[in-house]
Amino acid sequence: MEASMPKRKEPGKSLRIKVISMGNAEVGKSCIIKRYCEKRFVSKYLATIGIDYGVTKVQVRDREIKVNIFDMAGDPFFYEVRNEFYKDTQGVILVYDVGQKDSFDALDTWLAEMKQDLGPHGNMENIVFAVCANKIDCTKHRCVDESEGRLWAESKGFLYFETSAQTGEGINEMFQTFYLSIVDLCENGGKRPNTNSSASFTKEQADTIRRIRSSKDSWDMLGVKPGASRDEVNKAYRKLAVLLHPDKCVAPGSEDAFKAVVNARTALLKNIK
């Protein structure tokens, strides 16, 4: 009697997705896409005029994915062109240059632009965002460190990657994880899969770390008025210590923030009788 042959697993259905790139001009959006799709780096800067469009096919698990990529110009001049392309998007590559603080600070503005153009019925919770901290090869000029970028991304539930379009570092990992997350989204009824990144720390912890980073002096860091008493300083310190202690807080940058708070308390108490 012949042994029964094992059944061949049916390949998954093909999937078509739309991906857009967002970020200021000259942060490397086009170079990241070229590095992945064409395996090359273009050193000469050529500004994207309006929108560049490309199609690529990738294999994710057992599914063939046809990716429609819309590389959007970062110049404000092209806003009237960009605003037509935000709708029906499954994935966003959000890029900033680690050597340009203004490009990092502009990420919130880019999200606001997208939210506005999606309209009241648009839902950004059902889109996968991958944040690329690009040009990490330019270490001498870096002014946005990894913990600051990661904190911003993970506090919003976004994926975060350190990338270099020039060397290729982090590019393949980013796209593979990005596409996998989009497939999970599509298979999950259009709902963004839980990355567990935003659930690992609270908004209060993230906001406090940002505030400490930008504080102008030790008083400001502890959140007390100049001339505060020893008891007021200690009370403010204890509250921050409980919130940010590395044993209890896993938010990126929490350890440095905790050390800064300890140093601020020490400095203030030296001058308070």
From Swiss-Prot:
Its main location: nucleus. GO terms for molecular function: GTP binding; GTPase activity. InterPro entries: DnaJ_domain, J_dom_sf, P-loop_NTPase, Rab, Small_GTP-bd, Small_GTPase. It comes from the Eukaryota. Keywords: GTP-binding, Nucleotide-binding, Nucleus. The keyword GTP-binding applies. Residues 1-18 are annotated as: Required for interaction with MAPK1. GTP binds at residues 23-30, 71-75, 134-137. Residues 217-273 form the J domain. Pfam families: DnaJ (PF00226), Ras (PF00071). PROSITE patterns: DNAJ_2, RAB. GO terms for biological process: intracellular protein transport; positive regulation of ERK1 and ERK2 cascade. It is found in: Nucleus. GO terms for cellular component: nucleus. Belongs to the small GTPase superfamily. Rab family. GTPase which can activate the MEK/ERK pathway and induce cell transformation when overexpressed. May act as a nuclear scaffold for MAPK1, probably by association with MAPK1 nuclear export signal leading to enhanced ERK1/ERK2 signaling. Interacts directly with MAPK1 (wild-type and kinase-deficient forms). Interacts directly (in GTP-bound form) with MAP2K1 (wild-type and kinase-deficient forms). This is DnaJ homolog subfamily C member 27. The lineage of its organism: Eukaryota, Metazoa, Chordata, Craniata, Vertebrata. The gene is DNAJC27.
